[in-house]
Amino acid sequence: MAKKAMIERWKKPKKYKVREYTRCHICGRPRAVYREFGLCRVCFRKLALEGKLPGVRKASW
């Protein structure tokens, strides 16, 4: 879980667009964020296994 101050700083508008970066919308994790869902890999897996992400299925081949 990201520190509260880091999340608040991330939410503020940036002076330059190039300084913006992705964070997970649930836990605030800055790494391994899937842009399409706005979630980190940990939260994505958790929600997908619970069936809360429509159209996402576990792969099997």
UniProtKB/Swiss-Prot annotation:
Biological processes annotated in GO: translation
> What Gene3D superfamilies does the record tag this protein with?
30s Ribosomal Protein S14, Chain N (4.10.830.10)
Against InterPro entries, the record matches this protein to: Ribosomal_uS14, Ribosomal_uS14_bact, Ribosomal_uS14_CS, Ribosomal_uS14_sf
Any one GO MF annotation of this record: structural constituent of ribosome
Ordered alphabetically, the record's keywords are: Metal-binding, Ribonucleoprotein, Ribosomal protein, RNA-binding, rRNA-binding, Zinc
Q: Which domain of life is it from?
A: Bacteria
Which cofactors does it use? Zn(2+)
Matches recorded under PROSITE patterns = RIBOSOMAL_S14 (PS00527)
Q: State the GO CC annotations.
A: cytoplasm; small ribosomal subunit
Instruction: Tell me one Pfam family matched here.
Output: Ribosomal_S14
The note on cofactor binding and number reads: Binds 1 zinc ion per subunit.
Q: What does this protein do?
A: Binds 16S rRNA, required for the assembly of 30S particles and may also be responsible for determining the conformation of the 16S rRNA at the A site.
**PANTHER family, A to Z:** 30S RIBOSOMAL PROTEIN S14 (PTHR19836), SMALL RIBOSOMAL SUBUNIT PROTEIN US14M (PTHR19836:SF19)
Q: How does it assemble?
A: Part of the 30S ribosomal subunit. Contacts proteins S3 and S10.
Family membership, please give it: Belongs to the universal ribosomal protein uS14 family. Zinc-binding uS14 subfamily.
User: What's this protein's name?
Assistant: Small ribosomal subunit protein uS14
Q: Give me the gene this protein comes from.
A: rpsZ
